[in-house]
Amino acid sequence: MESKVREIHAPRGKTLNTKGWGQEAALRLLMNNLDPMVAKDPANLIVYGGKGKAARNWEAFDKIVQELKRLENDETLLIQSGKPVGVFKTTKDAPRVLIVNAQIVPHWATDDVFWDLEARGLTMFGQMTAGSWIYIGTQGVLQGTYETLSALARKEFGKDDLSGKWVLTSGLGEMGGAQPLAITMNNASGIVVEVDEEKIKRRLRDKYLDTWTESLDEALKMKDESLAEGKPTSIGLLGNAATVYDELMRRGIVPDVVSDQTAAHDLNLGYIPEGYTVESAAKFRDENREEYIKRVYASIVKEARAILWFQRHGSKTFDYGNNFRTRAQEGGMKDAFEIPGYVPAYIRDLFAVGSGPFRWVALSGDPQDIYRIDDAIIKNFQKDQHLVRWIKLAKERVHFQGLPARICYASYGEREEIGLMINDMVRSGDLQAPVAIGRDHHDTGSVASPYRETEKMKDGSDAIADWPILNALLNAISGATWVSVHHGGGTAIGNAIHAGFVIVADGTKDAEERIKRVLNADPGIGVIRHADAGYESSIDIIKKGPKFRYPYIN
């Protein structure tokens, strides 16, 4: 892997380094993805999720920056798996950038083939928001984790939160690092197992984690004390998830909730086998990859068997979309899929009404711009108290990484309202500079992923991948500033196709019209996708007469 010591920070303020705010937003968010406060391994262009990268190599990064700086307001830059390959004259309403990452003909869409092509410099794994330049640090998954636990509390315990409960989970990487804060935001306590001490320290630094220990006994003691005192606490435990889960099972200790958010989808880099440190695992992997993978599988199976034991003894368990069950099944565990997936269990009801992880980034770099938007949402969206509660919690407790940003689950209709409100605030001068508005690929109508977002669809359409392609094409012609289509995010190569977009609110009338189109179309196709699969809540929205038509409902 190429390694070059460079420290990247996004420009701040009102001064343009490019010929327009669309290009400027792409430049700043590409660089923000590689900020040391944001990225997992910026020296190697890795942003998060195993090997999810922002650009194929440093030469490609430099060429992207060069082209963004000279790109006209009626030109479009093409990115092929992290590498700029062309600039074409289009129109001012066309995307400034089109990104396609990691696409591979289905018959060849296997880990071995893909990573061989990647090693030869022919492709790049972009995860979801790494290669599409809209990663905002651990906050990017925070509300999804918060919403999952909140929905679990309502469904499983009949309560609005998890007060008095404790959660066992693992993984404090760029995605899993959201878990401890999401747990305490739901008024629960949690033990989060992590094998890498540096990741524990990073979550402490960013105020996502309250405390940590190397001792299971000490972690259990702290958990018990926090529950007795009614003081939600997140505890990082340095150790291996397979070892810890198995030991808790042997002791007969049954948590209220159990999950895992290691990067188990990546067998090479994402899951450290039992008995190894991060450093010794890397040495072992380099010396004997075949045996290393066998050990990884054995550890995943051991952890999964413990999770099933917890489930059978009363724990509420779920796979959090990291392909953990698939890896356990590949390792020989036939009943791995008795562990439910989190989307069909807890999140699909949100997706069905066009709700998902909406986000915005202050290109000024000033946190006050985000706080002003927070205040405006609290004032203007009183009809949605769940949204207001989240914004208040996030404003109080979320630490920014890189450019200040906010995420919230907003539904069809709300996204357009928020986008137009932000554009008005830029126009009026309430905000110091334009704002980039986007979302995760993990959303209502933008992904086909049978082990995660589209698992157990009502009509059996789990693997139908037309929808994310339609989503990307629709967003492009509606006026998104950049659009991306990726492969394999979250659940690994061969298991998902997904799309994303970003649109810039620069305060102009043109931006207003583009926002109206894009923020109607993007969640709207999610409503259609779920209505087409037979979800009543989606059908109900269409019957109310939204700003689109579905031919099968008059």
From Swiss-Prot:
Name recorded for this polypeptide: Probable urocanate hydratase
Pfam families, per the entry: Urocanase, Urocanase_C, Urocanase_N
One Gene Ontology term from the biological process aspect of the record: L-histidine catabolic process to glutamate and formate
Catalytic activity, reaction form: 4-imidazolone-5-propanoate = trans-urocanate + H2O
Function field: Catalyzes the conversion of urocanate to 4-imidazolone-5-propionate.
Keywords for the protein's UniProt record, in alphabetical order: Cytoplasm, Histidine metabolism, Lyase, NAD
Organism of this sequence: Thermoplasma acidophilum (strain ATCC 25905 / DSM 1728 / JCM 9062 / NBRC 15155 / AMRC-C165)
Binding positions (NAD(+)): 49-50, 127, 194, 240-241, 261-265, 271-272, 320, 490
Gene Ontology CC terms: cytoplasm
Entry cofactors: NAD(+)
UniProt keyword NAD, yes or no: yes
Alphabetical list of HAMAP family matching this protein: HutU (MF_00577)
Compartments, record wording: Cytoplasm
Keyword Mitochondrion: no
Pathway, per record: Amino-acid degradation; L-histidine degradation into L-glutamate; N-formimidoyl-L-glutamate from L-histidine: step 2/3
Similarity section: Belongs to the urocanase family.
Known EC number: 4.2.1.49
Active site feature: C408
InterPro entries attached to this UniProt entry: Urocanase, Urocanase-like, Urocanase_C, Urocanase_central_sf, Urocanase_CS, Urocanase_N, Urocanase_Rossmann-like, Urocanase_sf
CC cofactor note: Binds 1 NAD(+) per subunit.
Any one GO MF annotation of this record: urocanate hydratase activity
Taxonomic lineage of the native organism: Archaea, Methanobacteriati, Thermoplasmatota, Thermoplasmata, Thermoplasmatales
Main location class: cytoplasm
